Amino acid sequence: NILFPLQNLKGEDKLSKEEMLERAQKVASLVQIDELMERKPSELSGGQQQRVAIARALVKMPRVLLLDEPLSNLDARLRLQTREEIRRIQRETNITTVFVTHDQEEAMSISDEIVIMKLGVVQQIGKPQDVYDNPANLFVAKFLGTPPINVFNGVIKNGGVYIAEDRILDADIEDMDVYV
């Protein structure tokens, strides 16, 4: 199953059977499924099948690897374990990896850099901790964090920031409605 992407290579990219087997074995070892090489996909657990899928993607030695919701079908325990494995594999191979997820915990824990999008529009790009500490807008602020950030409607008036009737800060800027 891991060999399949290599069997379709053409021209100068084409590999000998020995080269294909060597690459497949190396990648299987990297994703820790080398002892499962003789099994059929139907004989593998969900986590093992996910590792085979990652191995198939890695065996071609891409410059960029796209993983689109790779953990979405795994149970919570396996998600955590596989997430750590993906991070380890990415670091060992040094392949630029685009990891698409709707799970903020996955994004924050696995990424060197994150892109927060809303309806296909980029809201913010940055290192996870920087984005968390300095959200670019209210959407990003509400999207990140467990538990979610507390947001209050406030107003700036007469040189102060108010929540309800309580003055909480001095603010020497024009009067306006704000989120605090």
Name each model-derived stretch.
Residues 1-139:
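ABC ATPase nucleotide-binding domains
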Residues 41, 135, 147, 165-167:
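Short, well-ordered turn and helix-capping elements at secondary-structure junctions
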Residues 53-54, 152, 161:
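Residue-level recognition of conserved structural "scaffold" positions that shape functional pockets
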Residues 90, 153, 169-170:
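Short secondary-structure boundary/capping segments
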Residues 126, 159-160:
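Intrinsic-disorder/low-complexity loop/linker signature
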Residues 134-157:
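C-terminal boundary and immediately downstream tail of ABC-type ATPase nucleotide-binding domains
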Residues 160-180:
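Glycine/charge-rich catalytic "coupling/switch" loops of P-loop NTPases
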